Regions:
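A contiguous, well-structured pocket-lining segment that forms one wall/lid of small-molecule binding clefts
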Residues: 75-105
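Phosphate-coordination/substrate-recognition cap region in phosphate-metabolizing enzymes
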Residues: 1-76, 84-85, 96, 137-158
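Active-site-adjacent alpha-helix immediately C-terminal to a catalytic or transition-state-stabilizing loop
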Residues: 6-7, 93, 100, 104-158
């Protein structure tokens, strides 16, 4: 549902002449929620918490950043965003995420929506974000868990 993924999808659809096809949007494929780090660039984050800690948060499988508290500058803008009026439920809305938590968020959509359509023989384009895609890749190949922090995703259309 985030703008970058939507723009990427529109570019792809235009290029392949499929601009009128149905599009499903879900918060479950959003980028990882960096919690209290949201809105800070890498330099600011490193100055406040130290470069080593920032790398742990960014690349660790199961270590989340600090949570986004209700007094955070962007809390209301995110939690009350009209795109999320119906989904996720308030108790499901993440306040922070590790890669592990991101996977737990993406897999219900993968298993419940994408896989059934693939089994029906449908062609699917997934326009999402790096960490949500990393989570799906990890699910597809559990051997990657030990090197997940080194995984860069490349997308190519032929």
């Amino acid at each position: 549902m985030l703008t970058r993924a939507q723009n990427t999808l529109q570019s792809i659809l235009k290029e392949i002449g499929q601009e009128g096809i149905p599009i499903a949007k879900t918060w479950r494929l959003n980028e990882r929620h960096y919690g209290g780090l949201t809105g800070m660039n890498k330099t600011e984050t490193a100055q406040k918490y130290g470069e080593e800690q920032v790398q742990i948060w960014r690349r660790s499988f199961d270590t989340p950043p600090p949570p986004m508290e209700p007094d955070h500058k962007y809390y209301d803008a995110i939690v009350k965003d009209p795109r999320y009026a119906n989904d996720p439920k308030p108790e499901e809305f993440p306040k922070f995420e590790s890669l592990k938590l991101t996977i737990e968020r993406t897999l219900p959509y993968w298993n419940g929506t994408i896989i059934p359509q693939l089994k029906e023989g449908k062609n699917i384009i997934i326009a999402a974000h790096g960490n949500s895609l990393r989570g799906i890749v990890k699910h597809l190949d559990s051997k990657l868990i030990s090197s997940m922090h080194q995984t860069n995703l490349l997308i190519k259309l032929n």
